[in-house]
Regions:
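Glycine-rich catalytic cores of cysteine/serine-nucleophile enzymes that process amide/ester linkages
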Residues: 21-121
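Short linear sequence motifs
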Residues: 52, 70, 87-93, 111-115, ...
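Solvent-exposed, acidic/flexible segments
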Residues: 38, 42-45, 90-94, 122-132, ...
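Acidic low-complexity segments
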Residues: 100-157
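N-terminal low-complexity, Pro/Thr/Ser-rich intrinsically disordered segments
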Residues: 2-24
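Low-complexity, intrinsically disordered/propeptide-like segments
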Residues: 4, 31-33, 229
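Activation targets extended, charge/polar-rich intrinsically disordered C-terminal tails
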Residues: 7-14, 134-244
């Protein structure tokens, strides 16, 4: 298998009257992974992570249900396994983007539908990047370190992962807004849970006490928002997938 990457860098020009050039050297990327798999092995929700490049270092913040998945009951419905919206909240902090994207590309590789990751990058200053890093460091302070590998560390956070939030998308946007406050300002216009949630989940949520949020919480909806980018101009776009 080979990995195909497509890239489109959007250049911006400085004002002709600008005397001193202060160029942002750091980068923030929102990584949006598609659903993958089919049938009982389908993972329907997609994934979102934050990738920071600053001072020659890489930080990928990857929050998900990577621990124990917990069954969730909604009236007459009980969702468990891959369809459950709840699980232990695990934060994986990667130090290598190539290692992260290699693992993402493997998701669903043996099924009829593998993962595609869409990356939307923004040039930011080091001080902005550090605001994002500090956001995650504060989460880590009260967490339990559960694994340390060559390319990432795993932390069990005090909060569960839940489909309506906190989840990979809501946490990624909360972190991103530390550096780019206007991110997802008009995100509510792109919320469309019917497009993403499987039928069982839709019925379960309708029978529950939960109301669908009016903020972005599903990766696929976030991807629609970032494609249009009504609030913040995207500087760098990349797509990652396995080439069959």
């Amino acid at each position: 298998m080979t990995t195909t990457t497509t890239s489109n860098t959007i250049k911006s020009s400085n004002s002709p009257t600008q005397q001193v050039s202060l160029k942002p050297e750091a980068e923030l990327h929102l990584l949006v992974g598609s659903a993958y798999g089919t049938g009982e092995k389908e993972s329907p929700y997609g994934h979102t992570a934050v990738y920071i490049k600053v001072q020659g270092k890489e930080y990928i913040y990857d929050f998900g249900r990577y621990g124990r998945i917990k069954p969730e009951t909604f009236g007459p419905f009980t969702l468990s396994g891959a369809s459950s919206p709840r699980g232990e909240g695990i934060l994986k902090v990667w130090s290598s983007f190539s290692a992260y994207i290699e693992e993402e590309n493997r998701q669903g590789a043996n099924s009829g539908r593998s993962r595609t990751t869409y990356a939307y990058g923004y040039k930011i200053f080091d001080s902005q990047a550090n605001l994002v890093i500090n956001y995650y460091n504060n989460l880590i302070k009260s967490s339990l370190s559960v694994q340390n590998t060559t390319h990432y560390k795993r932390y069990k956070l005090n909060q569960d992962y839940f489909a309506l939030g906190p989840n990979c998308t809501t946490q990624s946007l909360d972190a991103t807004k530390k550096a780019i406050p206007s991110m997802a300002k008009s995100g509510h216009r792109f919320v469309n849970s019917d497009k993403v949630l499987p039928t069982t989940a839709k019925l379960a949520f309708k029978a529950s006490k939960y109301e669908m949020p009016n903020y972005l919480f599903l990766p696929d909806n976030l991807n629609d928002y970032l494609k249009e980018s009504p609030d913040v101009k995207v500087n760098i776009k990349n797509t990652y997938r396995i080439n069959r």
